[in-house]
A protein has these predicted regions:
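Non-catalytic C-terminal accessory domains or segments of carbohydrate-active enzymes
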Residues: 1-4, 97-99, 108, 195, ...
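Aromatic-Pro/Gly-enriched surface loop or interdomain linker
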Residues: 1-59, 219, 223
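Structural motif
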Residues: 60-70, 98, 189-191
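The substrate-binding groove and active-site-proximal loops of carbohydrate-active enzymes
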Residues: 12-23, 40, 64-80, 195-196
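Catalytic beta-strand/loop cores that center a nucleophilic Ser/Cys/Thr
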Residues: 124-188, 193-203, 216-223
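Solvent-exposed loop/turn segments at secondary-structure junctions
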Residues: 5-8, 67-71, 103-107, 195-198
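Alpha-helical scaffolding within the catalytic cores
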Residues: 47-53, 82-85, 174-178
Length: 223
């Protein structure tokens, strides 16, 4: 889910013939991993969401990847109640969502991550410094991390991400959340701060998608 949809399918994190960029590689790895994963992938724009109330029918998991206030994650598109309601409703009714970087990032109505309540994490931008933040315990035994043989490589990662009270943190470093999971209604959300391409990270994304879709039992179908 981004501002381009099909217009930049498979190229939405590519810069100048996919040359390495420090600002980009932590997100490009998601596209790289998806390209070899056993999933059907559709590229959906925010205009698609507005134009067709059924555009998410048949979708199991949404993925929103990139820095806040960019076309990658949507920026001001999240001010549209129809967009926010469509995505929240999709997850609440049983869909999955994987957010990487600053998904739905846009300062508006007291939140930076507009899907904070869905993802279970928020970014500290100075407005919530006085909020108590007691949730820092890690849960490394989660399904998503079972293939990892070493600490997860988040690339550049993200600064200032904290978990809401009912969120399960998988990885935090120096009290900055790098990976977390959260239930929202009947649905599931996964937050990852960055995902440069590697074999292990491709497994992390694979497992994140299966878990968020309530489909862990399919893990060994294409092992």
């Amino acid at each position: 889910l981004n501002c381009w949809g099909k217009m930049r399918a498979w190229g939405c994190h590519m810069v100048h013939h996919a040359l390495y960029q420090k600002q980009n590689y932590s997100y490009a790895g998601v596209i790289e991993a998806l390209s070899g994963a056993p999933f059907d992938v559709r590229f959906i724009s925010f205009d698609d969401l507005r134009a067709d109330a059924h555009v998410l029918d048949g979708v199991d998991v949404l993925i929103n990847v990139g820095d806040g206030d960019t076309a990658h994650t949507g920026g001001g598109e999240w001010e549209d109640p129809a967009v926010a309601a469509a995505v929240r409703g999709f997850v609440y009714n049983g869909g999955g969502i994987v957010g990487v970087g600053e998904p739905s990032g846009h300062q508006y109505e007291g939140h930076y991550l507009q899907l904070a309540g869905v993802l279970g994490v928020e970014k500290e931008t100075g407005f919530t410094l006085g909020y108590d933040k007691y949730n820092w315990d890690e849960h490394p035994g989660h399904f998503i991390l079972e293939d990892c043989t070493k600490p997860v490589d988040f690339g550049e990662g993200k600064k200032g991400i904290y978990a809401l009270p009912d969120t399960e943190i998988l990885v935090q470093r120096e009290k900055e959340v790098q990976m977390a999971v959260h239930a929202f209604g009947k649905g599931r959300a996964v937050y990852i701060s960055g995902l440069p391409y590697s074999f292990e990270n491709s497994r992390v994304l694979y497992r994140s998608i299966l878990w968020s879709a309530h489909d862990e039992e399919s893990l060994h179908k294409w092992f």
